[in-house]
């Protein structure tokens, strides 16, 4: 059965020493239609500059602060509603999970099937995804 084209979604707090290797590895091993990165505005500008010469699938960078604006949410409003008590997790961690799992709400033309990838997971070999 031929695989349908798919996108990869990554939440990125900050570009690190391995970011290029992760993105180029994903492109090499999985040939995604596109890679969507959700990050803070300042990081988005830096990443656009850094990635110009990288060998990646098309990169689309999205502002995490207003990612859910079309459905009436902002990062601040979501985090303000969380009452975590003595949880080990921060409101920002929960928001990160919403960004990854709710990517279809904030990314126009996202593939029907998409892969959520952690930004620090280096793809050293191809694993079956579907």
How does the language model describe each region?
Residues 99-130:
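GT-A fold catalytic core of metal-dependent nucleotide-sugar glycosyltransferases
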Residues 38-44, 65, 121:
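Short beta-alpha junction loops
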Residues 6-15:
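A conserved hydrophobic helix/loop-capping motif in glycosyltransferases and polysaccharide synthases
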Residues 15-28:
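Short, well-formed alpha-helical segments that are part of the catalytic scaffolds
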Residues 46-109:
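Active-site-proximal specificity loops/subdomain of glycosyltransferases
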Residues 4-7, 27-37, 58-59:
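Short loop->beta transition adjacent to catalytic acidic/histidine clusters or analogous donor-positioning motifs
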Residues 17-18, 42-49:
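Short, charged/polar "capping" segments at the starts of alpha-helices
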């Amino acid at each position: 059965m031929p695989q349908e084209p798919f996108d990869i979604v990554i939440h990125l707090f900050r570009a690190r020493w391995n970011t290029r290797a992760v993105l180029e590895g994903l492109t090499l091993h999985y040939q995604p239609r596109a890679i969507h990165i959700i990050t803070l505005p300042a990081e988005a500008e830096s990443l656009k500059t850094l990635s110009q010469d990288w060998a990646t699938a098309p990169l689309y960078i999205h502002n995490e602060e207003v990612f859910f604006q079309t459905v009436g949410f902002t990062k601040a409003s979501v985090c303000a509603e969380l009452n975590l008590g003595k949880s080990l997790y921060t409101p920002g961690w929960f928001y990160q999970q919403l960004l990854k799992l709710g990517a279809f709400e904030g990314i126009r033309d996202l593939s029907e099937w998409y892969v959520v990838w952690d930004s620090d997971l280096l793809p050293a070999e191809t694993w079956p995804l579907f």
